[in-house]
Amino acid sequence: MRIERDIDFGRPRRMRCGRCGHEELVSHDWMESWEQCNELCPECGIDCTEEDRARPTYDPDDPAIVDHQVLRMFWYHTSTIPDWPQKEFDPREKLTPETVQCMTRMLGAGAVDRWTEQQKSKALHVGTYEAAIENMLRRMADQPEGDAPFYLYRVVLDDAVGIEPGVHREPTNWVGDAQPEKFLTPGHSVYRYINEREDEGSISLALTADAIESVSGIQIPVATKTPARKKQRLATWQDVQLKVKEASVPDRVRPRLAGAFRPVSASNTDHLNLDLLDGLVDLIQDPSHILALLDSVEPRQV
């Protein structure tokens, strides 16, 4: 029996001070104030500018710290790739001739081939449902891919894979890639880390493709259950913010939800309609509807 964890985008977050070790559950308001240097560690008094400042950490009761529980859980991932994880793909397809020339000039002969192999061998990432949805919102804001649709994948791990002991810091480099040989020891395919960017304090996994048994995927956002209506365009950034403010979602998610619309709103060339906003809100406020859709999909063996 697989474990489906409770989904709560608005739950309190656990913070741990890197200097004194103090841990405390805090609200979204506290975290927002902390990031603006308006809060101090209640034990040692440092603020967010210090290298060993307080950071999100995992709950000591999180079942993901127990190896056999990790293998029984559903994990999630969002991607614009319709058949993730791909077995056969050529990363060079996304490179323009100008990029290839630049890489060769700056990094020498064979640079493109080396980069290609790194892209093919880099770790895959899965996490909580909340982390997967928030990752999609961040990518929509920071790495817009035009009209490329997103897919939500529910991931089942192979029961026989080895899990690296402990829960660690995220092993990615400055562009978000992680090479398994740098953090996985022989016999292990799964690496737990604290996610500090999405669903802060949750445990995510960096893993190799052979750790995955199967995936079930749906395109998101899905059609909402709101009544049919005439298309209404979001003409300005202020319109987007107002609609997000009216949405029934936790405060901590509102900036991320609005941020997903910023690139298109700022360009003023292609305005998003309310159906997309309703669909994104539905992913957050009615996850049971989304999980039911995933239940209806035949898992694909990897």
PLM regions: where:
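Short metal-binding segments enriched for Cys and/or His
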Residues: G45-Y58
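ADP-ribosyltransferase catalytic core
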Residues: F9-R13, C37, A109-T185
